[in-house]
Amino acid sequence: MPTLDWLNRAHAFTVSARVPYRLLEQVSVHARTPGGHTTPPAIPAAPAQAELVKEPAAAPTLPSKPTHDNLLIQGDNLEALKALLPFYRGQVKCIFIDPPYNTKSAFEHYDDNLEHAQWLSMMLPRLQLLRELLREDGSIWVTIDDNEGHYLKVLMDEVFGRGNFVANVVWQKAYGPRSNAFLLSDSHDHMLIYGKSKPTLRFGLLSRSDEQTAKYKNPD
């Protein structure tokens, strides 16, 4: 199977294993006012420091189940994914991510203007950890545009296995031409879908409406 090669590729393949486990520090989600109402807490100026486990090769001793079903984690997403492994390894049914498109757009919270090699090195360890979180019948859905979409497809073939590729869903993002387009005005982006184990993958089917059923003349 063809694979991508880029500067620091060998290093990128070891990043997910070398990222240290960090304990998640639980904070209060709501603060109660004197009147009895609940309000969101103030956003801290910087993420709270997490305790660094001395031996990153081994998972820390953590509760068998998180205190809450819903988690909102503030911090580097690579470290956050590693911190979730002891809780959710092999248990997640569906993952959706919207990574940086690497299109020279201005974003406040991450660099959206990386060189191709840097972008691939950023994506690889995160995809590796995401695969570990998936159940055998789980799937991952990734939105991307033409700028890195084809490189991402080959990279995900390597991480998830080409045989586990489900589809490239093309979705329309614009309904009219852009006046500032240099050559052609693109109107679509992509969503790459992979299963961890495609033979076990099942999607829930939507029920047919009466209006849709009325279009069929022959009974099933």
State where each predicted segment sits.
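Short, surface-exposed basic-aromatic patches at helix termini and helix-loop junctions that form
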Residues: 86-89, 154-162, 185-186
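Conserved nucleotide-binding/hydrolysis micro-motifs of P-loop NTPases
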Residues: 101-102, 146-149, 174-176, 197-200
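Flexible, glycine-/basic-rich loop-and-beta segments that form/coincide
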Residues: 176-220
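Structured core elements
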Residues: 72, 96, 141-143, 170, ...
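DnaQ-like (DEDDh/DEDDy) 3′-5′ exonuclease domain used for proofreading
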Residues: 1-96, 103-117, 122-125
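Conserved Class I SAM-dependent methyltransferase catalytic core
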Residues: 116-170
